[in-house]
Amino acid sequence: MKKDIISGQTGVAASAAVVAFCDVDDSLITTTRVSPCEGAEPCAVDDKGLVCGYLSPKQRVLNQLLAASAQVVLTTARSSKGLKNVQLPVSSGAYAIVSFGGVILTPAGCPEPRWHQRMSEESGQYAALLDELCAHIKDVAAEKNIDVRVRVVVDAGLPLYVSVKHNQKNLFELCTIKAAAESFLQEHHPAAARQQMFTHFNGNFLAFLPPFLRKEYAVRWFMENVAAPGALSIGLGDSESDLAFMSLCDYVLMPSRSQAFAGLRR
């Protein structure tokens, strides 16, 4: 029987020895409504069916390389529903960590029951706070005439975090919303603020995460409970917030034009 070069074990596929935790937007794909370069192919749509993501030729090579050599675990802020709107070479029949780690999807597309039970217990403690924060942001946006979409993201029946996106991609006004929301938390929910309510802000995406919700928590649990023992791990991401889960891995990979890489160079 042929001995696998990467795993070093007879009859063991290379993908069993390597697990790659990969962010999706602006890592495996380019999030844009306009083709980013010649040869790019549409690979993602929004809820209205309009193209919102492309796969560049180099990203296609990266996707194919990962699919051929690793167990790929998509690790994304996208919800379960949002991930279904993305078509990638690595996404078929794979595990996925979605909604900032709030849900781990099995290859069958169902929530991993052990992790889901844990998140169900945690999320129930913060449901009212998320609703209150969402309502406050809507009030601030209306008062200041800021055109944003605000919602509590619910995935697999669990209220997980508050998402804010500007309809004209006005980052200055998003910063205004960010400051108002953080001030509200400090004043009205100081305990939650001290427990590290986390603000994710990258491009036109602003999100407020309760203390239990982090990609790195789900990645660590996956490593301990699902991944093959001793597997080589790779972390791929583009946001500064991705560095936390990437740092759990043996090797780190990021786009050279990304928030994460720019932060490391500062």
Predicted ranges, named:
Residues 136-234, 240-248:
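Conserved acidic, metal-coordinating active-site core of Asp-based
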Residues 4-20, 24-72, 80-84:
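Active-site neighborhood of HAD-like aspartate-dependent phosphohydrolases
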Residues 248-266:
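Asp-based, Mg2+/Mn2+-dependent phosphohydrolase catalytic module
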